[in-house]
């Protein structure tokens, strides 16, 4: 981008009555040499920008990986940085623990899960949860014209809801408006309401320095074996629906909404919206219908396996 994000400076403050370097709060300060309008997002949430010749922004970050997005006009720059967890004096550093989906979702370890619906099960007996990613204060990625990913997601999710209902499925949405259900509340609800499968809808964007024309692809993610076969079946059809977008296949990634051990779950990244062509395609209701029909066909293939 032309007006690059110059700095993302971490400033740590000592806990009360402690000496440096013990910390309990970490803040990020950014600056850019421009007098144009900027927007700054920290972990998907817009934060206040204070004008100080260029600008100054301050927001609390959390231990682990954080994402800082700087948006100016049609340009978006994304920087990721890590913050160490404050340690007690004399404490040895310990590696981070892997996610425990049972603990995360409050599922008993001895819980018995329903099998995948048998081939020939009437669609009306199959419960599908459709999740429109992001929402509320979490906007997700931004398109060149400033449209937010959360809005692309809800449009595609509602289109999918209609397509599933036309095929006879029972459908539940995690959100139908500009709300933000907490990430773990989405899969928890799928468990609580005994869903047979869970589909999360997202749209992608390149990170800092990335070329969206080179990076542009569609992909469907799963986080465990239970979801991977579903992801593969869906991605085969989605890839054809969004041609000539490159097919990145079905991939495994640890995602909060997909680590559900009880319900087969996957996350579909339809297209790259920070590319004008991807933005235009994702805003096209005809293309949305094609993607929705593709996901339905993928689900039907998976059920027949």
Residue ranges and their predicted role:
Residues 2-305:
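Catalytic-site microenvironment of enzymes
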